[in-house]
Regions:
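Metal-dependent catalytic core segments for phosphate chemistry
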Residues: 12
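GG-anchored amphipathic helix commonly corresponding to the ABC/SMC/Rad50 NBD signature/C-loop
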Residues: 5, 15-35
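Walker B catalytic acidic pair
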Residues: 38-39
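C-terminal lobe/lid and adjacent interdomain/linker elements of RecA-like ASCE P-loop ATPase modules
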Residues: 47-136
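Conserved D-loop-proximal element of ABC-family nucleotide-binding domains
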Residues: 29-30, 42-50
């Protein structure tokens, strides 16, 4: 098959990961102060998500990184965790953004990993996950 432009054959997630790889290589020379990645982890395994999270953490040492994710492997790597929620109020959709403290963050990581019924074991796992990420 004839080669085609990457923009025509790659998925949104693949394009995001290609961008991540490029940004990781040129971050020191890049004049962009903030990098935004929207669900860069779509369609990847937990292990791949962890590797992406580590790369984003490395980039964040030089640049501000904003990343939307639905995976705990990515969320635990953040220095700051913002929770974005959409709610219906009457006939309107209202979006709220709030910064999570450590306990709220632990709960959110547990929720991402296991759903709405959070157990003490899930919270312990989330706490350990956060500690492990701090050491990476």
């Amino acid at each position: 098959e004839e080669p085609k432009p990457i923009a025509k054959i790659a998925s949104g997630g693949e394009l995001s990961r290609i961008m991540l790889a490029l940004k990781n290589v040129i971050a020191e020379k890049d004049s962009i102060g903030t990098l935004i990645f929207d669900e860069i982890d779509t369609g990847v395994s937990g292990r791949a998500a962890q590797k992406i999270g580590i790369k984003l953490k490395q980039i964040s040492r030089l640049r501000q990184v904003l990343c939307v994710t639905h995976l705990a492997q990515m969320a635990v790597m953040a220095d700051n965790h913002l929770l974005i929620e959409k709610n219906i109020q009457g006939d309107r959709t209202v979006t709220t953004v709030r910064t999570l403290d450590h306990e709220q963050r632990k709960y959110e990581i547990a929720r991402i990993m296991g759903g709405e019924n959070i157990t003490e074991l899930m919270l312990e796992n989330a706490e350990q996950y956060l500690k492990d990420a701090d050491n990476m």
